[in-house]
């Protein structure tokens, strides 16, 4: 009897699985909000230099006198005249023709309070020469996500999924709330970094805890459900940000609920598969019996014993318990191949994804509308991805999603700038494909790695994804060399990465591997199957020729 049979014996997808999966994925609604929160909390409203305070002129006259105009006739954002220019006679009785010298803003800025009455940009003047600090805040958040993926991926293998998840909920609640009260920009960045760390841990432990409590035939459904909840969170962010335009209130609103998640997470049941892989057979038995009781399978739970578990989980009990570090991924050729290929897939997906979703103001339409559209496209994209995952397999779904996303982005690079509808449609389609790719890669990675390094593998994959999200904003700076250069790079990377899926095995309908030997055996079985198919094809060729 394998572990999957034990899950079926205690109820399969019963009341426990339904309740725990719901409670575990609920925080993902707000995790999506945190990842793209800076689209709203760091939005840049229209702005211009503040004229000198002692001019005694009306506002319109001040703008005419002190501010040069850009190519579209609007007041310049970052420059002002060194002395008052054209217009009616000024207090000193002079007037000029508007050709005076300019200088950077020296008295601060005036911001248009219409759409964004309060953001970190308006509060700390992150414009003009300080504009790069806005991107720094998002990059530091992604650095936190990278650190969290490495640290909490390792801790989840050593301490368990449940303990790490509880810690991450508390850290997100505290750091997110403190960020809302940050007195200055450095303190804000520090708390955002801590939030990124904990949210990475939540993402990894959420997927692993759910997958390890679900039977084989339902794992794809759970992975797709998690993806849909994340997409729903993007809808939620658009509505909440529209209703709560002030950044401190918005930051608070998406952080305080994690205190509630922290409280109810104490009632989660630790993964019995992790217990068994850690050699804690007594706790494995207690966890399975508790789940059987919740699922109404008391007799089946009572029939379980230490002897039954020893016979059923012999492989897990004989595994090497001491190795769960990242170096284990490079220890043998089969794991090394998995690690390198999956790392490329994680990097490419995140790199292209954040290249699109973190520049919503660049579309020239309502930022709230674009946020809703980007969330809406995930629904059909992930549905199609789910159907492909369950019918054709994980490998073709992963390859197709990355390839199509890259092609859409590359085409967007050659579409004229004035074709805004076409460019937006291609960006939305590409974003949908990347969302489907994220959905698949989480599930695919969890199914490829053996139990004792599964969380480490997910952590390292997420680490490479975060590297992609950190590098992505830097690539946008190449637009100064050529406007479409970022799109060409964002598109070429996923197209190239899609080829790596050809080196990965298919996991559709396969049990989760518990040991490295299981991974090697799976690869040998697939090689034998491919060899048999090739021999059958060779045998069919002479028959067709003779016919």
Swiss-Prot record:
Q: Which UniProt keywords apply?
A: Cell membrane, Glycoprotein, Membrane, Transmembrane, Transmembrane helix
Q: Which GO terms describe its cellular component?
A: basal plasma membrane; basolateral plasma membrane; plasma membrane
**Gene Ontology biological process terms in this record:** alpha-ketoglutarate transport; organic anion transport; prostaglandin transport; renal tubular secretion
In this UniProt entry, which residues form the Cytoplasmic topological domain(s)?
1-9, 157-164, 217-224, 270-337, 390-395, 445-456, 506-547
Reactions listed under catalytic activity: (6R)-L-erythro-5,6,7,8-tetrahydrobiopterin(out) + a dicarboxylate(in) = (6R)-L-erythro-5,6,7,8-tetrahydrobiopterin(in) + a dicarboxylate(out); L-erythro-7,8-dihydrobiopterin(out) + a dicarboxylate(in) = L-erythro-7,8-dihydrobiopterin(in) + a dicarboxylate(out); L-sepiapterin(out) + a dicarboxylate(in) = L-sepiapterin(in) + a dicarboxylate(out); prostaglandin F2alpha(out) + a dicarboxylate(in) = prostaglandin F2alpha(in) + a dicarboxylate(out)
According to the record, glycans are attached at: 39, 56, 92
Q: Where are the transmembrane segments?
A: 10-30, 136-156, 165-185, 196-216, 225-245, 249-269, 338-358, 369-389, 396-416, 424-444, 457-477, 485-505
Q: Which residues lie on this side of the membrane: Extracellular?
A: 31-135, 186-195, 246-248, 359-368, 417-423, 478-484
The record's annotation in PROSITE patterns points to: MFS
Q: Where is this region: Disordered?
A: 511-547
What highest taxon heads this organism's lineage? Answer: Eukaryota
Q: Which GO terms describe its molecular function?
A: alpha-ketoglutarate transmembrane transporter activity; antiporter activity; organic anion transmembrane transporter activity; prostaglandin transmembrane transporter activity; sodium-independent organic anion transmembrane transporter activity; solute:inorganic anion antiporter activity; transmembrane transporter activity; xenobiotic transmembrane transporter activity
Q: What InterPro entries does UniProt report for this protein, alphabetically?
A: MFS_dom, MFS_sugar_transport-like, MFS_trans_sf, Orgcat_transp/SVOP
* Alphabetized Pfam families for the sequence: Sugar_tr
Per the annotation, which location comes first and is thus the protein's main one? membrane
Q: Where is the composition biased (Basic residues)?
A: 522-531
**Protein modification:** Glycosylated. Glycosylation is necessary for proper targeting of the transporter to the plasma membrane.
Q: Where in the cell is it found?
A: Basolateral cell membrane; Basal cell membrane
Purpose of the protein: Secondary active transporter that functions as a Na(+)-independent organic anion (OA)/dicarboxylate antiporter where the uptake of one molecule of OA into the cell is coupled with an efflux of one molecule of intracellular dicarboxylate such as 2-oxoglutarate or glutarate. Mediates the uptake of OA across the basolateral side of proximal tubule epithelial cells, thereby contributing to the renal elimination of endogenous OA from the systemic circulation into the urine.
Give the note: Involved in the renal transport of a variety of drugs with well-known nephrotoxic potential, therefore may play a role in the etiology of the drug-associated nephrotoxicity. Uptakes the diagnostic agent PAH/para-aminohippurate and clinically used drugs. Mediates the bidirectional transport of PAH/para-aminohippurate.
The family assignment reads: Belongs to the major facilitator (TC 2.A.1) superfamily. Organic cation transporter (TC 2.A.1.19) family.
This protein is called what? Answer: Solute carrier family 22 member 6
């Amino acid at each position: 009897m394998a572990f999957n049979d034990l899950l079926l014996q205690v109820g399969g997808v019963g009341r426990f699985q339904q309740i725990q999966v719901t409670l575990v994925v609920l925080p993902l609604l707000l995790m999506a909000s945190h990842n793209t929160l800076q689209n709203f909390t760091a939005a840049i409203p229209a702005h211009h230099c503040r004229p000198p305070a002692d001019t005694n002129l009306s506002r319109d006259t001040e703008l005419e006198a002190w501010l040069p105009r850009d190519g579209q006739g609007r007041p310049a954002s970052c420059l002002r005249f060194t002395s008052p220019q054209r217009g009616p006679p000024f207090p000193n009785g002079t007037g000029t023709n508007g050709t005076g010298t300019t200088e950077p803003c020296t008295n601060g800025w005036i911001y248009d309070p219409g759409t964004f009455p309060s953001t970190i940009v308006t509060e700390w003047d992150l414009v003009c020469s300080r504009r790069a600090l806005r991107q720094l805040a998002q990059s530091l958040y992604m650095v936190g996500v990278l650190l969290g993926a490495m640290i909490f991926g390792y801790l989840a293998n050593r301490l368990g999924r449940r303990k790490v998840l509880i810690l991450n909920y508390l850290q997100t609640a505290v750091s997110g709330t403190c960020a809302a009260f940050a007195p200055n920009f450095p303190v804000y960045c520090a708390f955002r970094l801590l939030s990124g760390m904990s949210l990475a841990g939540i993402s990894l432990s959420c997927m692993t805890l759910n997958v390890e409590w679900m039977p084989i035939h339902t794992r794809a459904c759970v992975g797709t459900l998690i993806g849909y909840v994340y997409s729903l969170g993007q809808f939620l962010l658009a509505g909440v940000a529209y209703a709560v335009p002030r950044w401190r209130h918005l930051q608070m609103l998406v952080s305080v609920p994690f205190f509630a998640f922290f409280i109810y997470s104490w009632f989660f049941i630790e993964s019995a598969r992790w217990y068994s892989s850690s050699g804690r057979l007594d706790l494995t038995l207690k966890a399975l019996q508790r789940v059987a009781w919740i699922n109404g399978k008391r007799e089946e739970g009572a029939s379980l014993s230490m002897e039954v578990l020893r016979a059923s989980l012999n492989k897990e009990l004989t595994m090497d318990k001491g190795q769960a570090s990242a170096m284990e991924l490079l220890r043998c050729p089969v794991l090394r191949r998995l690690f390198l290929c999956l790392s490329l897939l994680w990097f490419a997906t995140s790199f292209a994804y954040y290249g699109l979703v973190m520049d919503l103001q660049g579309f020239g339409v309502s930022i709230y509308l674009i946020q809703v559209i980007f969330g809406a496209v995930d629904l059909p994209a992930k549905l199609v991805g789910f159907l492909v995952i369950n019918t054709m397999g994980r490998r073709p779904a992963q390859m197709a999603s990355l390839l199509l996303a890259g092609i859409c982005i590359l085409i967007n690079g050659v579409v004229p700038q004035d074709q805004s509808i076409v460019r937006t449609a291609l960006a939305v389609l590409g974003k949908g494909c990347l969302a489907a790719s994220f959905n698949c890669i989480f599930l695919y990675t969890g199914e490829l790695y053996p139990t004792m390094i599964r969380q480490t593998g997910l952590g390292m994959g997420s680490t490479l994804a975060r590297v992609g999200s950190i590098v992505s904003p830097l690539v946008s700076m190449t637009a100064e060399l050529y406007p479409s250069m970022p799109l060409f790079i964002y598109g070429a990377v996923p197209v190239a990465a899609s080829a790596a899926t050809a080196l990965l095995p298919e996991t559709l309908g396969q049990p989760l591997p518990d040991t490295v030997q299981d991974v090697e055996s799976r690869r040998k079985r697939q090689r034998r199957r491919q060899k048999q198919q090739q021999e059958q094809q060779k045998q069919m060729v002479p028959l067709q020729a003779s016919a």
